[in-house]
Amino acid sequence: MKHTAEFLDTHQTQISSILSGGYNHPLLREWQNERQLAKNMFIFPLFVSDMPDEDQPIESLPNIRRFGVNKLAGYLKPLVAKGLRAVLLFGVPMKPNSKDEFGSAADDPEGPVIQAIKLLRAEFPELYILCDVCLCEYTSHGHCGVLYDDGSINREQSVRRLAAVAVNYAKAGAHSVAPSDMIDGRIRDIKLGLLAAGLAHKTFVMSYAAKFSGNLYGPFRDAACSAPSQGDRKCYQLPSGGRGLARRALRRDLDEGADGIIVKPSTFYLDIMADASEIAKDVPICAYHVSGEYAMLHAAAKAGVVDFKSIAFESHQGFLRAGARLIISYMTPEFLDWLS
């Protein structure tokens, strides 16, 4: 005998349990998002070489290239036309003997970052320019500060050197400085340096307050030639399980004068982003979708595991849901097209 489908009497269902009427249409699903991705949220990282005519693909970062100053304007012009609003500059010294123990090339007036700042201010007056402030790309040892003879970080000299670099970027025309070194006390010294230079009122200090050590930076270190020659950065970058430390670092950097906060990496640290949006609710929170995260999504899409556009939106919408207002993303060029 054929079984007859049975229907239970559900007349006691609570009205409040019916949710699907709120998202049964594509527009309704958009309205359910607390925030929408928009072009003005995106910050595009740029690797700027001290070889003026360089235009070199980075194998471990699909679709990302390293440019010399002479190639920057031509590359950026169509992106600016599509709505690019902000870039984050990383200098990459490639010339022989360009690195030393103090990272002297970081703020060399003839170096890649200061030359790029001046070029971009002239060519794209409306483009917002952030500069990463760190020494790892420029030091002979590849660490983010000045070292003692035993290889440990000399905090006092490091923060003084980082402050000098930040001030020199601001003097050259950078709108924002973004210290990524994670050395204790550098936000205070940078803020004091900007005050002394008369630039604090027009320079946004975007602190990498919650930057974790881990396994997601490999492609970046290829691009920036910044891997440590010995040891690692675990003594100054946060341990991956250190949520309490991250909360303390967020409070510290706010107390020292940070105007904005970066959480890095992002996908695996949404709890930290949510913490940041609570602790630093009065300043912009920025998610950094780092090189390893970007490369993983490309690899998954290439293997046919995911659709690249769909996973890009899902991951980046997750940052907004966790509390980010801004996103540093290597996918910025794609999003400029997708959001048009």
UniProtKB/Swiss-Prot annotation:
Binding-site positions, 5-aminolevulinate 2: 291, 330
According to the record, the signal peptide region is: none
PROSITE patterns documented for this protein: D_ALA_DEHYDRATASE
* The entry's keywords: Heme biosynthesis, Lyase, Metal-binding, Porphyrin biosynthesis, Zinc
Metabolic or biological pathway, per its Swiss-Prot or TrEMBL entry: Porphyrin-containing compound metabolism; protoporphyrin-IX biosynthesis; coproporphyrinogen-III from 5-aminolevulinate: step 1/4
Note accompanying the cofactor annotation: Binds 1 zinc ion per monomer.
Could you tell me what reaction this enzyme catalyses?
2 5-aminolevulinate = porphobilinogen + 2 H2O + H(+)
Q: Where is the active site?
A: 211, 264
Q: Where along the chain is 5-aminolevulinate 1 bound? A: 221, 233
How is this protein annotated for GO cellular component? cytosol
Q: Name one GO biological process term.
A: heme biosynthetic process
Needed cofactors, names only, are: Zn(2+)
Sequence similarity: Belongs to the ALAD family.
| Subunit structure as annotated in this protein's UniProt entry | Homooctamer.
| Task of the protein | Catalyzes an early step in the biosynthesis of tetrapyrroles. Binds two molecules of 5-aminolevulinate per subunit, each at a distinct site, and catalyzes their condensation to form porphobilinogen.
Question: What is the name of this protein?
Answer: Delta-aminolevulinic acid dehydratase
Which species does this protein come from? Eremothecium gossypii (strain ATCC 10895 / CBS 109.51 / FGSC 9923 / NRRL Y-1056) (Yeast)
